[in-house]
Design a protein with these regions (language model features):
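Intrinsically disordered, low-complexity activation-like regions
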Residues: 1-54, 157, 211, 239
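Acidic, Ser/Thr-rich, low-complexity intrinsically disordered regions in fungal proteins
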Residues: 37, 45-239
Length: 239
């Protein structure tokens, strides 16, 4: 299994890094037989239940772009599309066993997700699949997996630079279509919503330094780390 050829300069030296095209990090990885068996031959059988249910209250996947990708059947997009369709089927599926975490569909989706993280972690399909799996885990109370999956999705969004288009290093060049740009942005919004929910137990109103040092040492430490006074600190969300 070939690993993703990620541009190392993105992390090592942002000044010399140049944004790459969206196809630069694509892969020709084949769809596993077990995934094909779970999806079947009719993609519409997966899409229709999703867009008539989940998409009505959590819209972040473009139906038009998805249909275009299915019809194009591009070799570099097939693996990512299969992952996304599998995760769409997962969130619309009602497990028939008592333990949702042990369902075949969930275990296969998690396994394929881990595989695609190695071969094509920066694709939009992978990003969206993480959001769907996190949504499923939150909805079925699968913890701490839900917490960890949301963290993975958040880090992918940060790597792509969606959180700050002006100041953050942009991994990819500006997309050719407005539709892609909007879909990517909505996926980040979906991630942010899940992040606020999954991280709720870790919210604290203040960040305290527990130590026996004298106060002048604490003042110096606060200045060194650029921490504002306690009275000015807002609620912090920790990943």
């Amino acid at each position: 299994m070939a690993a993703c050829l990620f541009p190392d300069a993105f992390f090592i030296d942002a000044e010399i890094f140049r944004s790459v095209s969206h196809s630069a990090l694509s892969t020709n990885y084949p769809v596993p037989p077990q995934v094909s068996a779970l999806l079947g031959l009719d993609a519409a059988a997966v899409c229709e239940p999703y867009f008539s249910s989940i998409d009505t209250w959590f819209p972040f996947i473009s139906r038009k772009r998805l249909n275009q990708g299915i019809q194009a059947n591009t070799s570099t997009e097939t693996a990512g599309l299969a992952l996304l369709l599998l995760c769409m089927k997962l969130v619309t599926n009602t497990p028939v066993i008592s333990s949702t975490a042990d369902s075949t569909l969930y275990r296969e989706a998690r396994s394929y997700l881990n595989t695609m993280e190695e071969v094509s972690p920066m694709s939009l399909h992978f990003f969206q699949s993480l959001v769907l799996v996190a949504l499923f885990e939150i909805g079925h109370g699968i913890f701490p997996a839900a917490y960890l999956t949301v963290g993975r999705a958040t880090r992918i969004g940060l790597l792509r630079g969606i959180h700050d288009r002006k100041s953050a290093t942009q991994l990819f060049q500006k997309p050719q279509t407005w539709m892609y740009w909007e879909e990517e942005r909505r996926t980040w919004w979906a991630t942010s919503i899940l992040e606020r929910w999954a991280y709720a137990p870790c919210q604290i109103s203040h960040y305290y330094i527990h130590t026996n040092f004298q106060i002048d040492i604490l003042i110096l430490a606060r200045q060194a780390f650029l921490l504002p006074p306690l009275s000015q600190r807002k609620m912090i969300f920790y990943p």
